[in-house]
Amino acid sequence: PVLDEFDYREYLAGRGVGSVLRGPRVVRLGAGEGSTFLRTLYRWRQALRSTVARILPNPEAGLLSGILLGVGHSLPADLDEAFRVAGLSHIMVISGYNISLVAGALLLVGRKRLNYWVALGLCLAGVAVYALFVGLSAPVLRAALMALLVIGSQYAGRRSHTLTSLAAAAFIMTAANPLYLWSASYQLSFAATLGLVVVEPAMGRRLDARLLQSGDPQRAARWSILARDVLLVTLAAQLATLPVMWTQFGEASLAALPANALVLPVQTPIMLLGAAATALGLLWAPLGRVAAWLVWPLLRYCLWVVETLGGLSSATVA
């Protein structure tokens, strides 16, 4: 199809699709000939998605499926549009934050409970399997490659360098598929990470210098931590991705900064409580529904922010 604001041909080309054929019917020639491992993995993913749908109502179930499993198109079209306008579509995409939690948990368990080689294998395999489980989109692949490089460097007794890991991930991905360079998700993922690695520390140093002028180091440290966690991280990512948003989509969200500042602090509790409720629901649905009441208010809060800010007529500049 020819769309006014989206180059669908370029989108398909970035995924290795050169032509699209449509036939009048499909004839099934065989079954069970694919990868048993991947088939099992995707069945588990579908089972978890079904469990989320059983323990939570919509649209909260759709939001949790996006946050935990990276399942797209699980929300009504108008709510999807509100997420885009509010600059919060990224929370529905598995990214470096999810990968870092998985890698951190594996590192913690591996170092304390297992010997060197078993722990290293567990960490590397765990990150790779999780990346396959949620789907190898550009942000997931970028985050997984960086995590594998950081884990490998730590177990080799070498200091990891985030900017070097980012450059290495970019090299590996573009060497494997040069068309990634034209992918909006690839550009946004690397731009946001670059903002967090380069822009946020520079902004933080300037803020610390200003706060220290107040004469109270302890108070300055408290305000610095709060500002970094709530504002600077969001601001750095937004500034870094602004050129990509403008060139790719021809617009920028004015609501993105306040929306992210309001929503990002509750993402970790949502992931942890949501994962626990889903695991319990997988064992026994009524137990999962009880546990889901802990995460439902947080999901409802996120949706309220999206509906409020995403519904403003002045939320974007085109």
Q: Could you describe each region identified by the protein language model?
A:
Residues 56-60, 160-161, 199, 204, ...:
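Proline-centered turn/helix-capping motifs that create local helix->coil transitions or kinks
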Residues 65-69, 173, 192, 237, ...:
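Generic alpha-helical structural context detector
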Residues 21, 75-256, 318:
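Hydrophobic alpha-helical transmembrane segments in multi-pass membrane proteins
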Residues 1-90:
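Membrane-interface helix/helix-cap signal primarily in integral membrane proteins
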Residues 50, 66, 81, 127, ...:
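Short amphipathic alpha-helical coupling elements at transmembrane boundaries
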